[in-house]
Structure formats: C-alpha cells, structure tokens
Amino acid sequence: MHVVILGSAAGGGVPQWNCRCSICSLAWAGDPRVKARTQSSIAVSPDGERWLLLNASPDIRQQIQANPQMHPREGLRHSPIHAVLLTNGDVDHVAGLLTLREGQPFTLYATPGILASVSDNRVFDVMAADVVKRQTIALDETFEPVPGLSVTLFSVPGKVPLWLEDASMEIGAETETTVGTMIEAGGKRLAYIPGCARVTEDLKARVAGVDALLFDGTVLEDDDMIRAGVGTKTGWRMGHIQINGETGSIASFADVALGRRVLIHINNTNPILIEDSPERAGVEARGWTVAHDGLTLDL
C-alpha cells in the first residue's frame, strides 16, 4: 500500500493567509524550521497507479502539482485519482471538490450524513451527476473504492462542521458526521483519523495492530489558539483532542500496539511545527512523527 500525505495542516494551512502568530511569522520569513503546509488530504493506492483521495482540500490543485503520482498521464484528460472519500463535511475537506469539476469521472464516497451536507449545497452541482457518481457508505460496511483497496468507515467522537452548527450541536458525539477510515491492501492496514475529539476504548481496540495510524494532531494543548492570542476556541470546542496530557492522544495510545504513529491535520498555532522546538522533540521522543506535505509511507 502506497500513502502520500498531500496536505498535513488543519484548516487554513501554514502559514494562514492573514496570520502573524509566532509560528506563521517564522513561515512568512522563510525560516527553514517551519515548513509551509497545505490543508488536510492524503492519497492511498494499492499499486501506485490508481489512487483514492481522502478529503478534497481547498489546496488540491497545488497538491496534485506538487506530487507527480497525481499528475495526468495519458490522453487529453486523465487523472490517477479514481475515487474520493470524505471523513467529514469540514470546509477544508470538501472545498476542493469544486476544483475537481473539469469533466473527469470519479466516484465520491461518504456516509449518508456527510454526503447530504454536500448534496444540500447547490454549489457542488458543478460536479455533474453524469460524470461524478455519489455513493453513500454505511458505517462498518467494507467497500472497495479502488480495486485492491478495502475500506471501512467507523464513527469517532467529533462534531458537525462549523458551517452546520446550531443550538443542538453536541461535541464528542459518535455519529456518521465524523468518521475514521480503516484501509487494507496487501495484508497491511492503515487507520486514517484526521478529526477526533477523544480516544475511546472502542477506538483503541479498533486500531490496535495497524501498520500505520495517521491521527488528529490539531492542537498540542487544548488552549493552543488562546495561548497564541489568535482565537478563543479550545481544541475540544473545535472537535479535536489535544496531543499532550493524561487524556491526550499520545497518552491514550501509549498502551496500544501500533506501527507508524503519525500526527496530521496540524493547526498553525501548534508548536510542534517548529522543527527544533522542545515540543517537537517531545512528541518524537514518544514515538510519533510530525507529518509534512509530501511525506510518503510504503506499507
């Protein structure tokens, strides 16, 4: 199984377009310790030829250009991307669908709830129904979006997208609006979970023994954005678990047998983005890799 992390940042990327927090300021200045990162997306293939895109980042055209595996290869129009799968309806995961409208056939997969959030917004009708097939997938149903690639969706604690929030919103609920993905090919297993509000015992049992876990690394501490002075929301309020602490992701998975442990969907205020920082050293010392754009895994 071949995995390419196309975009390793959370919504807005690094640096964010209007941000001068300490981390974005380093990126704007060209400091090599802070790599520029695009918004959350990965691609997975069983053979290096046919690819499944997981989440369609607003930066998808840039990501395709930066990764030769994603380039058109034959004829006047072609794409190695045969299918797209959404893990939630967040803007940084669906806006890129608007770029994928140029008459290229593929199938769009998501749970009924996630797909409804797309279908209810007429702007996505630019993906012509006779070109882009939309396929609903039930939780815990195994399907094959690309030949040789088996995928199963499962609920994880999360919340509805910001643009769908209302008075009834519940943070940490396990519904079909935020899902994790188990991907299998050639006897290897990859768990992809870019958004998760907390780690449950059921989640730990589900991912135990995977060859690689790509997991929500949005915030190091729950109050990252508040500390940086750029916002008032905690990680929890945004539906994202913190990395550090007794209930954080690293501690929660410490007793779980895993292969590669990779942090993805990293917010611009997260100090692990600074390569020589004590925060980066701390997560690496505990066995985790901080993802960057273009990182590849061959499982």
From Swiss-Prot:
SUPFAM superfamilies: Metallo-hydrolase/oxidoreductase. InterPro entries: Metallo-B-lactamas, PQQ_synth_PqqB, RibonucZ/Hydroxyglut_hydro. CDD domains: PQQB-like_MBL-fold. Pathway: Cofactor biosynthesis; pyrroloquinoline quinone biosynthesis. The keyword Repeat does not apply. One of its GO terms (biological process) is pyrroloquinoline quinone biosynthetic process. Keywords: PQQ biosynthesis, Transport. Belongs to the PqqB family. May be involved in the transport of PQQ or its precursor to the periplasm. This is Coenzyme PQQ synthesis protein B. It comes from Methylorubrum populi (strain ATCC BAA-705 / NCIMB 13946 / BJ001) (Methylobacterium populi). The lineage of its organism: Bacteria, Pseudomonadati, Pseudomonadota, Alphaproteobacteria, Hyphomicrobiales.
